Regions:
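Glycine-rich, acidic loop regions that bind phosphate or pyrophosphate groups
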Residues: 37-145
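A cross-kingdom feature strongest in bacterial/archaeal respiratory oxidoreductases
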Residues: 3-5, 9, 14-17, 25-27, ...
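Loop/helix-junction capping segments adjacent to catalytic residues or to phosphate/diphosphate-binding pockets
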Residues: 19-22, 66, 110, 174-175
Length: 328
């Protein structure tokens, strides 16, 4: 391990880490409270350049890109390759001609991964006898609020491509049920190369996790009581797909952008639902009350606002508990 002790210091890790390493680092990060910044390696950039298709799972809001997201979008757009963007936030600024965009319901990442894996298995004639054969596609699509047509279009793109990359953001890494997500990803990594890119500020970090440290990582995780994720899906795991949390009310999407005064950008629908009438208000988000500047944006849709200037190292969609103008 180069730098200092990662159990109480920020840490840089490569975007091309194995699923096992990323999982244990994220669990230890949550347990010990240190931040992880994933850095795009040269290998990762080469992989992206050689991919016929990139599936971007989460993030990539042009209103507030992090350094990894910016590099990836530049790489894709220079070559005009097709890519897919999957996330709950709906922002028309992010809809490019070469982009297949599909939104889904907050907290339903497991359903989306299961549907993608099942779709690939079906299209490649490998579904018969697989655990996911029993999954009700209509039910899961409905729970995730993604149409079966959008799903079929996405699966067709993936199967058609010869080299594919799946780029994981905070929606996966910081998810409360990420053990199950990593089990699903274990199946998907047979069909897509997987990269991890959550990054707040790698320039401010000196400690670097290297794959040579894997033995130390596994020992530390065991010592800290971190349970491993299952490498293969079992029938009883499908129960987890029926217990996904519901996302009711209004949410903020936490951006990486730094501002002196926090700013909340939102849709007309959000403004009406939350009875917003002024240019500033105090919002309670997790354990903080933030005095935010308010701005209606014609580009945004739905009940998810973009929060800039107040970073939470967590799953990026956070419910608004209350605000000073009487949100319920």
């Amino acid at each position: 391990m180069s730098g200092f002790n990662p159990l109480n210091s920020p840490l840089i890790a490569s975007s091309s880490l194995s699923l096992k390493e990323a999982y244990y680092l994220e669990k230890l990060s949550l347990k010990k409270g240190f931040k992880i910044n994933y850095k795009l390696s040269e290998d990762s950039l080469n992989l992206l350049e050689k991919s016929d298709l990139c599936v971007l799972f989460g993030g990539f809001s042009n209103a507030c890109l992090n350094e990894n997201e910016r590099w990836i979008l530049e790489s894709i757009n220079q070559s005009k390759r097709p890519y897919a963007l999957l996330r709950p936030l709906q922002d028309t600024r992010d809809l490019q001609e070469n982009c297949l965009f599909a939104s889904y319901e907050i907290h339903t990442e497991a359903a989306i991964l299961a549907l993608i894996l099942r779709g690939i298995l079906e299209k490649t004639s490998q579904l018969k006898g697989h655990v996911l054969e029993k999954v009700d596609v209509g039910y899961l699509s409905s729970e995730a609020n993604m149409s079966e047509e959008e799903l079929q279009e996405l699966i067709a793109l993936i199967v058609k491509a010869k080299k594919r990359a799946l780029v994981l953001n905070r929606e996966i890494a910081k998810h409360a049920d990420n053990a199950f997500l990593y089990t699903l990803l274990s199946g998907l990594q047979n069909y897509l190369e997987i990269l991890h890119i959550p990054c707040y500020d790698s320039s401010a970090t000196t400690a670097f996790y290297d794959s040579k440290d894997q033995e130390w990582l596994l020992k530390t995780a065991l010592k800290e009581g971190v349970l491993p994720f299952k490498s293969q899906l079992k029938s009883k795991d499908l129960e987890l797909l029926e217990r996904m949390g519901e996302a009711n009310g209004s949410f903020v999407y936490v951006s990486y952008k730094s501002l002196e005064t926090p700013k909340l950008s939102f849709s007309k629908q959000f403004k009406i639902a939350n009875r917003i009438q002024h240019s500033k208000a105090g919002f309670q988000i997790l354990d903080k009350t933030l005095e935010c500047e308010l701005e209606e944006s014609p580009h945004l849709k739905g009940l998810i606002a973009i929060l800039e200037g107040a970073f939470f190292d967590a799953y990026p969609y956070i419910p608004i508990l209350s605000h000073s103008q009487g949100i319920s």
